[in-house]
Amino acid sequence: MKNIVNYIFEIGVLKREKHNGFKLIGVDNLGSVAEHALRAAQIGYILTVLENEKHGTDISPERVASILIFHDNGEVRIGDLHKVASRYIDSKEAEQTAFVEQTERLPENMAKTLLEYYSEFENRNTKEGIIAKDADWLESAFSAKEHYDLGNTLAIDWILNVEKALETDSAKEMIKEMKETRFTDWWVNLKKMLYKKMDGNYVEHGKD
């Protein structure tokens, strides 16, 4: 149990590890790797359900989400290396080494499962791995769209590069819709004024 407790403390570092790619286009308020993994896992779950409905498949959304929750854990030890850094450092090899060493402290069956997750994600050799990779890319594209809508036009490169890389039909449909949607659209209708008649007077609600 001591090793498991230490593992959990270790992955907590992801809350403080920044997702560094957008640093290159002048973004100061970088999200954390933990935040990236959480939204990617939820996107992965959604994509899997959509793909199953579209193609009549029975891919596990829970497995896809699990792959994504764990996939960046190696970055605790090597950091989140952006593409320019990867020109000089073999980040894939370093991250894999870190991930393997992390799992060595875990119970054998647990470690085996996590290593399978990692392999599926990196190699895209299963349907779950393909969807997980699409979800990971999409999360970066959604983050890029948020920066783009706030005025950083350089973020468009992330969106276009992700769009070219996506494999699943549902991911391709999602990014097409995302490009046409402002990141604030979800709350616009929630902020509309509502009026309720009370004692002959109209009282305004939902103003703030």
Predicted regions and their residues:
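Alpha-helical, largely C-terminal catalytic domains
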Residues: 1-208
